[in-house]
Swiss-Prot record:
Gene3D superfamilies assigned: Cupredoxins - blue copper proteins
Residues in Plastocyanin-like domain copies: 1-67, 79-238, 354-488
Biotechnology: Terrein shows anticancer activity on various tumors including cervical carcinoma, ovarian cancer, and head and neck cancer. The secondary metabolite acts as angiogenesis inhibitors through the inhibition of angiogenin secretion. Terrein also has anti-inflammatory activity. It shows an alleviative function of age-related inflammation characterized as an anti-oxidant and might therefore be a useful nutraceutical compound for anti-aging. Terrein may enhance osseointegration by decreasing the level of ROS and has a potentially synergistic effect on osteoblast differentiation.
Name of the protein this chain belongs to: Multicopper oxidase terE
Lineage start: Eukaryota, Fungi, Dikarya, Ascomycota, Pezizomycotina
């Protein structure tokens, strides 16, 4: 289980990324995770499985409240959580099998009506004899109040744009759990892995009376899919029964869409969000090196692959020893973090050799390396190949310490031009931002001629040693290989001086740190001292 947004606050082996930071949990067993949010990490996060397609349903909100006695920087009356997810009419195993079969082509699954959740099996139509059906979510609010709306991007695949009928004055106050200066917007846009907090001030009773209604549609639409799906929820006011405009709204989608949401999504809030407080943004002269991660889809007779710079990584096949991306044999060795605890610096590639010969990537372990204290510009590039499947957008996510988001644009990345755009602007700290597509794939890259068709730039100040994932957060793309692993720091920094003898139960597959119905796990508590201090 991954604690999305709080990776840097986890105990060793608690990041939840199997084969990177821990052994997988055996069926029928369980594992105690330990996290300790730090002051300054209050915000909107979520948890989800990090295995296969499980995160489409094994996920939920994770809200870190302010330290006792401290108030949020912006006043509001109440808050609501909007957790956006997707429903597929196939099982997880069906989806994974189709993604990994030879010559498979990833397509959008058909949109489903609201009442198709009432099914005896997840891949059949509902029983028409069922009395109850699943209608839109109803979000209750009171008139003339300010609400903090916490929106969490839990979809597997889709980027979602959403608007609120007759409520277009929204103010972003936080992104990915970090407070920002207030930024006005008329709609919200969110992809897998992202979180946005915004303020919504509800209408007064007089305003509701003039409008003649007390319920308003929340309209959500997917983008960049062969079939863009529209979904709805309701913003419903609690109003006195004696008011003439008090009404009952039919819980079926409206025949006519109440809002017209734009198709253009790639410029939403770009170079707009700024941190509420200074965040230590390192300027270009502090950058030590640049790493380019190219997102592309590759086709071989074995199947279709979502790759990073012509390489793939999954929890079942780490492609160690420079094995090609199309090799399908299961190749799951010792998890990298476990190996570092066992063998120390011998389990970490030589930094100088890796950087000088391979741009920071080690072909033997299929990992990237970084030194604590260095500043790295990470440039994600979108390269279509002119084939029908070869072009998509990607929500890139980083575990561990978060990044400064330097913006995005079409074509190839130009560092000089982007630095000009950054003048007078302080980038925010994020953990998930979008690598967009700016043109339909059929118009570029003919005959498998890969060309740059979009970029996203990050600046990472390496301060959190560990074994961390950097990957596309689209679940389908993760299954197809669009993931990377980074070793940040040396062995003593990563292990923090903890001896392997005290962690033996974590270092073996099915060790005694994993419990089951017969026995409780033997847990090494890493934050006991800190928790005692807090309680005092």
């Amino acid at each position: 289980m991954h604690w999305h947004g709080l990776s840097q606050s986890t105990a060793p082996f608690s990041d939840g990324s199997p084969q990177a930071s821990q052994w997988p949990i055996k069926p029928g067993e369980y594992f105690d995770y330990e996290i300790r949010p730090n002051v300054g990490e209050a915000g909107t996060h979520f948890y989800h499985s990090h295995v296969g397609f499980q995160a489409v349903s094994a996920a939920g909100p994770l809200i870190v409240e302010e330290k006792h006695g401290k108030s949020p920087p912006f006043p509001y009356d109440e808050e609501r959580i909007l957790f956006i997810s997707e429903l597929y009419n196939k099982t997880d195993s069906m989806t994974e099998t189709e993604l990994l079969r030879p010559y498979d082509v990833v397509r959008c699954f058909p949109g489903m009506s609201a009442n198709e959740t009432d099914t005896p099996e997840p891949w059949v139509m509902p029983d028409p004899s069922l009395v109850e059906s699943c209608g839109p979510e109803v979000i209750q609010v009171d008139p003339d109040k300010t609400y903090r709306m916490r929106v969490i991007g839990g979809p597997a695949l889709n980027l979602v744009t959403m608007g609120f009928e007759d409520h277009q004055e929204l103010s972003i106050m936080a992104a990915d759990g970090k407070y920002t200066k207030l930024a006005k917007t008329e709609r919200i846009q969110i992809a897998s892995g992202q979180r946005f907090d915004f303020l919504l001030h509800t209408k007064t009773e007089d305003e509701l009376r003039r409008l003649g209604k007390s319920a308003f549609w929340i309209q959500m639409e997917s983008r960049y899919r062969p079939m863009n799906v529209s979904s709805y929820a309701l913003l419903s006011y609690n109003t006195p029964s004696d008011l003439a405009f008090n009404q009952t709204t039919d819980l079926v989608p409206p025949e006519k869409q109440p809002l017209t949401l734009p198709n253009k999504v790639y410029d939403w809030l770009e170079y707009v969000l700024e941190p509420l407080e200074p965040n230590g943004f390192p300027t270009a002269d502090k950058v030590n090196r640049t790493v380019v991660l190219t997102s592309l889809q590759l086709i071989a007779k074995e199947g279709v692959y979502a790759a990073v710079s012509n390489r793939t990584w999954t929890e079942t096949n780490q492609h160690r020893n420079n094995t090609p991306f199309w090799k399908r044999e299961h190749q799951a060795g010792t998890p990298y973090l476990v190996d570092i605890f066992r063998r120390g610096d011998e389990a970490i590639p030589d930094y100088e050799t890796t950087v000088q010969k391979h741009g920071g990537w080690d072909p033997d372990l299929n990992v990237y390396v970084a030194k604590v204290g260095e500043v790295i510009d990470i440039i994600m590039v979108n390269q279509p190949n002119g084939l029908d499947i070869g072009f998509d957008l990607h929500p890139w996510h980083i575990h561990g310490g978060h990044i400064y988001d330097l913006g995005s644009g079409p074509g190839s990345y130009n560092a000089t031009a982007n630095e000009e755009k950054l003048k007078g602007y302080n980038p925010v700290i994020r953990d998930t931002t979008m690598l967009y597509k700016y043109t339909p794939g059929q118009y570029v890259g003919e005959n498998k001629n890969f060309t740059d068709q979009g970029w996203r730039a990050w600046r990472l100040h390496v301060q959190d040693p560990g074994v961390w994932m950097v990957h596309c957060h689209t679940l389908q793309h993760m299954i197809m290989g669009m993931q990377t692993v980074w070793m940040m720091g040396n062995a003593s920094e990563i292990t923090r001086g903890v001896s392997p003898e005290s962690l033996e139960g974590y270092l073996n597959y099915g060790g005694d740190a994993y419990g089951n119905a017969s026995y409780d796990p033997i847990v090494q508590h890493h934050f006991d001292y800190g928790l005692q201090q807090i309680l005092q």
